[in-house]
Amino acid sequence: MTSSSSESRTYPPRPILAVSAAIFRDFRDGRVLIVRRARPPAHGLYTLPGGVVELGETLQQAVVREIREETGLAIEPVVLAGYREAIVRDGAGRIERHFVILPFAARWVGGDLVLNEELAEARWLKPAELSALDTTEGLAAIVSTACERIAALG
């Protein structure tokens, strides 16, 4: 992520718009890049790489930038794969975090996989392998939708 402060993402006055990507090296192979978070939010969980949309960015620009920053990969966003809301409450019931996340199905087009400090690990996995991992809520459904939408494009 760039210079946006993480403090403004805790106890936000409104939902925060974010993007992520189910990145495929080869759509026929079906393996998708799954990463494990090295810090909050979702510390230690497997998920899709991505991050917050910055003011003035389109969703596609944001997902390309975030993936490059977090993984070193160049991608081509192909199609939206649904949406997800992540709402986390603290012990007093106050909303600590509220993200609206728009995941893309994307094609890897270049770059070498180099993780930044936000990520602890990355794996290219088949969707069926996700059930063995501790993942963010809804990850398997998002990856499944990404696969379906890619297949529908032919």
Give the positions of each predicted feature.
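Active-site segment of metal-dependent pyrophosphate-handling enzymes
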Residues: 72-110
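Conserved beta-strand segments that form the floor/walls of ligand-binding pockets within enzyme
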Residues: 18, 47, 103, 124
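Short loop segments at secondary-structure junctions
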Residues: 25-29, 38, 107-112, 127-129
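Conserved N-terminal beta-strand and adjoining loop/helix that marks the start
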Residues: 2-32, 83, 105-107
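A generic structural micro-feature
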Residues: 11-15, 45, 94-100, 119
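Nudix hydrolase/Nudix homology domain
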Residues: 112-154
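Conserved Nudix-box catalytic region and its N-terminal flanking loop in Nudix hydrolases
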Residues: 29-70
